[in-house]
Amino acid sequence: MRLRAFLPVLFLASPVSAEDVLRVAVASNFADTAGILLVAFQHQAGVEFRLTTGSTGKLYAQVVNGAPFDVFMSADAERPRLLEAGGHAVAGSRYTYARGRLIVWSSTADDCMGALYDMSAGKIALANPVTAPYGRAAKEFLIAVNAWDAAVGRIVYGQNVLQAIQFAATGNAPTAIIPRTHANHPAMPRATCTAAVPASSHAPLEQQVVLISADNEAARGFVEFLRSDAARQEIVAAGYEVLP
C-alpha cells in the first residue's frame, strides 16, 4: 500500500510527551519523501516528529557539534561513515536507503546537453559541491563530459538542492543540474528539455541513514521502518532507486 493514503489521518494524531519526539535531520533533496515516510511511521508508532532539512555537509557539521538529532538521513555515504568513525553515531547502524540520479533541466534550451557548452545559454544552477553530494556529482559530471571550462563561469551555486531549484524556478538560471526526483517539482516552470546524466559520469549517489541516538527506541524503529516494503515502495515512487 502506498503511504500517501495515510496522510489525511496522520496529522490528526494526538500530541505525545516531549521525550517521544523523533528528531530527524534530512538532506534537502529527500525532504518531501522523508515527510511522507515520517507521517506513516507516526501512524504506526504513535510518535511526533521534528524534521530539519539542509545540505548534507551542514547537517553533518551540526551533528558533530552536538545538535540534538536522533536520525540523520544523508545524501551520501561518506558523512554517515565519518559520524560512525568519530563516535557521533551508533556503530553498525548505517545503510543505503536510496540511490539518486541527476538530470540536466532547461526552461529555454532545445538541447539540454548543448546548453552546457554554449556560453550564450545563460546561467547554470547546481547545489554547492562542497556541502551537497548532488552538487559534487554535478561537478564531476561536467568535468567528465568536458563541459566544466565552458560552464564554470556561468554556474550559480545553491546552498542545497532546493536553493538550486529556486534559482531555476525564478529564471535566474535557465539551466540546472538537479535530482531526477525534482524534475516536476511544483516550483519548476515547464521544461523545454531534460536529459539524463549518465550514472557512470560521477560517483554513485548512495544516500545513507545513520542512527544518532542509541537510546531512542522511536529512532531505532524509524531506521528499521525505512527497510520495509511500504517505505521502499514510496522511495521508488518518488523517483529514487533502492538496493536489493
Where are the language model's segments positioned?
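Exported/periplasmic ABC-transporter solute-binding proteins
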Residues: 19-53, 57-67, 74-77, 81-90, ...
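Sec-dependent signal peptide recognition
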Residues: 2-9
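Absolute protein N-terminus
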Residues: 1, 18-19
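N-terminal signal peptide c-region/cleavage motif recognized by signal peptidases
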Residues: 13-15
